[in-house]
Structure formats: C-alpha cells, structure tokens
UniProtKB/Swiss-Prot annotation:
Keywords: Cell wall, Disulfide bond, Secreted. This is Thaumatin-like protein 5. Its main location: secreted. It comes from Taxus baccata. The keyword Disulfide bond applies. Belongs to the thaumatin family. GO terms for cellular component: extracellular region. It comes from the Eukaryota. It is found in: Secreted; Secreted, Cell wall. The keyword Disulfide bond applies.
Length: 10
C-alpha cells in the first residue's frame, strides 16, 4: 500500500 507521503508527492 502506498504511504501518505507517496500520495502527497504526486
């Protein structure tokens, strides 16, 4: 599962 930091990076 993608981390919240990964989602924020987009």
């Amino acid at each position: 599962n993608a981390c919240s930091s990964d989602l924020n990076s987009k």
